[in-house]
């Protein structure tokens, strides 16, 4: 086994490191720099440029220069974030089988292919640095990346000729790089604000174990968004002075983007900077120049809501971890955007602790990934990473209920099974709808995929045993299978991400679940009452048909009338829990006479004991 490199495939910049000689080392690229711009360009001569060379020619070739590709990785074309990206990015985003792709000179490229070109350069530069072939890597992703985004990242590695041994979450990787696994037992918060994504993770460390307690974030919040606020401000000022909408000119927009990014960086050390873009555009009166002073105070006011959004996520993640702010012993700052003074000031003020900035925020994630590579190779001993799944996973069961199989916050890798049954007599197949979210009802959660298990042997409802297994691997990628325990027939689905979950949706789901907690509970109670009523009506009708001859006519009619009344109540969509329970109780009382008649009959069948492992929920 050769050397395993750790790669931080970033939105703005990427970095790589290797673990050798009992330490992690950053690998410089061929240009001698520790980070490589995550930019790919296609020239008119047919050349493909990656990194610094692509960045240098971006102003003169904006429509064929691809940056921030991570923002559309695993994104569906019809999502709001895709429409937002279309407005912001100068290159053409197109629909490819429902997912986002880009079009350059009539050819369509997936985000995986573009990312693979970045990874190929990193791989080649690592081989040049190490003097040997590199075929294996650990690649980091934001903790809040969903299943489709993780798969897309792994596919990019495969396209680049890398065997991706592990997909690791960026905050967890950062914790390793800081050596937090070797400290006394502590509660650590990692605040990771990169170029395009934001993560906040609370971990417990000690005794060479790094355990994630809770994680949150936004895959569409980062330095790019801070740049965009400056771009919007400058373009609005320019329009008010000249009447020209500068953002309609892709070449001017690219110059504006570079100027905004540079201004942001300069304001990290200066209180004021000047943006000077001569000949930015022209109209009938001649060329126009953009010259504008931007103060740190103005920049902070333009981006204040973005900073506050990160603070609100800190608050919710600490709450999810079951902790208070005072229990956080250390705050680790990761990502280039944490250099913004106001970001540091707000985080420090909220947590009321000094910030740990001991490692370069642009390099720390790659360093951690290389340490994980060392763990997998066996060079690093006794380090255990325990990450978690950010949302609950389950299936839709009878009545449209979300039945959870793996709860939110479960340590991964994880594998869990539950046994379900059929909802109808002689049901030949079941449909398994895989869901992700925190709401009680299936329709309020995100559908990840659906598959059918065919060939179920004819049997009364509730008799077949269908074992559904959820398996999340160490990369956070999900496989769901279903098996008929009687026939042995099985079916499985690897969640393809065709309806992948965006991180903003995850955040919204958690908030919606909290807002609708009581309402959802009431709805679930009604559904459970209806399911119980339906089961009793079905079983009583079946028993009545078999043993009617053992009853007098009045008793038989009384039971049948009670069954009919309960069925009418079940069919009424507006029936309340109380109404369903009342009708169920009346039928149960009427059916006592049927039970007595069955007991008195010598050949009465004893009710079959229900399998303790069978979950009292049915799949349709």
Swiss-Prot record:
Enumerate the CDD domains for this protein. ASKHA_NBD_HSP70_DnaK-like
- Phosphothreonine carried by residues: 197
Matching PROSITE patterns: HSP70_1, HSP70_2, HSP70_3
GO terms of molecular function: ATP binding; ATP-dependent protein folding chaperone; unfolded protein binding
Gene3D superfamilies per UniProt: 1.20.1270.10, 3.30.420.40, Actin, Chain A, domain 4, Substrate Binding Domain Of DNAk, Chain A, domain 1
User: Short name of one Pfam family for this protein?
Assistant: HSP70
Question: Which superkingdom is the protein from?
Answer: Bacteria
Region Disordered: list its residue ranges: 597-620
Sequence intervals crossing the membrane: none
Q: Which UniProt keywords apply?
A: ATP-binding, Chaperone, Nucleotide-binding, Phosphoprotein, Stress response
Q: List the disulfide bonds.
A: none
What induces it, per record?
Answer: By stress conditions e.g. heat shock.
Its family remark reads:
Belongs to the heat shock protein 70 family.
Q: What functional role does this protein have? A: Acts as a chaperone.
Task: Enumerate the HAMAP family for this protein.
Answer: DnaK (MF_00332)
Instruction: Write down what this protein is called.
Output: Chaperone protein DnaK
């Amino acid at each position: 086994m050769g050397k395993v490199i750790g790669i931080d495939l970033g939105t703005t910049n990427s970095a790589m490191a290797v673990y050798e000689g009992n330490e992690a080392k950053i690998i410089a690229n061929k240009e001698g720099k520790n980070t490589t711009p995550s930019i790919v360009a296609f020239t008119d001569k047919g050349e493909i440029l990656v990194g610094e060379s692509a960045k240098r020619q971006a102003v003169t070739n904006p429509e064929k220069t691809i940056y921030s590709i991570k923002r559309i990785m695993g994104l569906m074309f019809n999502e709001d974030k895709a429409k937002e990206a279309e407005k912001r990015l100068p290159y053409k985003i197109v629909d490819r089988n429902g997912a986002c792709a880009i079009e350059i000179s009539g050819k369509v490229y997936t985000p995986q292919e573009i990312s693979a070109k970045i990874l190929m350069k990193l791989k080649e530069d690592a081989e040049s640095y190490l003097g040997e072939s590199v075929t294996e890597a650990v690649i980091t992703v934001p903790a809040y990346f969903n299943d489709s985004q993780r798969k897309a990242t792994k596919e990019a590695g495969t396209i680049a000729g890398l065997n991706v041994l592990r997909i690791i979450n960026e905050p967890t990787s950062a914790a390793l790089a800081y050596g937090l696994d070797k400290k006394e037992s502590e509660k650590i918060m990692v605040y990771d604000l990169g170029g395009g994504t934001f993560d906040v993770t609370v971990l417990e460390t000690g005794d060479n174990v790094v355990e994630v307690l809770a994680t949150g974030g936004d895959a569409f919040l980062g330095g790019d968004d801070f740049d965009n606020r400056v771009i919007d401000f400058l373009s609005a000022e320019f329009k008010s002075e000249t009447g020209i909408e500068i953002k309609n000119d892709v070449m001017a927009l690219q110059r504006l983007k570079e100027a905004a990014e540079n201004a942001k960086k300069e304001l990290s050390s200066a209180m004021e900077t000047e943006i000077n873009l001569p000949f930015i555009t022209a109209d009938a009166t001649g060329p126009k120049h953009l010259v504008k002073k931007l103060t740190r105070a103005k920049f902070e006011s333009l981006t204040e809501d973005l900073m506050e959004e990160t603070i609100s996520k800190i608050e919710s993640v600490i709450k999810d971890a079951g902790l208070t702010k005072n229990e956080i012993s250390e705050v680790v700052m990761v990502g280039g955007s944490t250099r913004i003074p106001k970001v540091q000031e707000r985080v420090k003020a909220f947590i009321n602790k000094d910030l740990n900035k001991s490692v370069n925020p642009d390099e720390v994630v790659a360093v951690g990934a290389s340490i994980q590579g060392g763990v997998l190779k066996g060079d690093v001993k006794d380090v255990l990473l325990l990450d978690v799944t950010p949302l609950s996973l389950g299936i839709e069961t009878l009545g449209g209920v979300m039945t959870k199989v793996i709860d939110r916050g479960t340590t991964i890798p994880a594998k869990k099974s539950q046994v379900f049954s059929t909802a109808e007599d002689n049901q030949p197949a079941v449909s398994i709808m895989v869901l992700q979210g925190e709401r009680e009802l299936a329709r309020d959660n995100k559908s990840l995929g659906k598959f059918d298990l065919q060939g179920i042997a004819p049997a009364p409802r509730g008799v077949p045993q269908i074992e559904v297994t959820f398996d999340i691997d160490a990369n956070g990628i999900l496989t769901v299978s279903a098996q008929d325990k009687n026939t042995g027939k099985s079916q499985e689905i690897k969640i393809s991400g065709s309806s992948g979950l965006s991180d903003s949706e995850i955040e919204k789901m958690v908030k919606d679940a909290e807002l609708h907690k009581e309402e959802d509970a009431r709805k679930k109670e009604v559904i459970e009452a209806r399911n119980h009523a339906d089961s009793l009506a079905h079983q009583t009708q079946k028993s009545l048909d078999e043993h009617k001859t053992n009853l007098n006519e009045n008793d038989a009619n009384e039971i049948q009338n009670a069954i009919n009344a309960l069925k009418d109540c079940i069919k009424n969509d507006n029936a309340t829990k109380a109404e369903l329970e009342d009708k169920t109780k009346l039928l149960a009382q009427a059916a006592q006479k049927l039970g007595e008649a069955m007991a008195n009959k010598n050949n009465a069948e004893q009710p079959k004991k229900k399998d303790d492992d069978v979950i009292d929920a049915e799949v349709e």
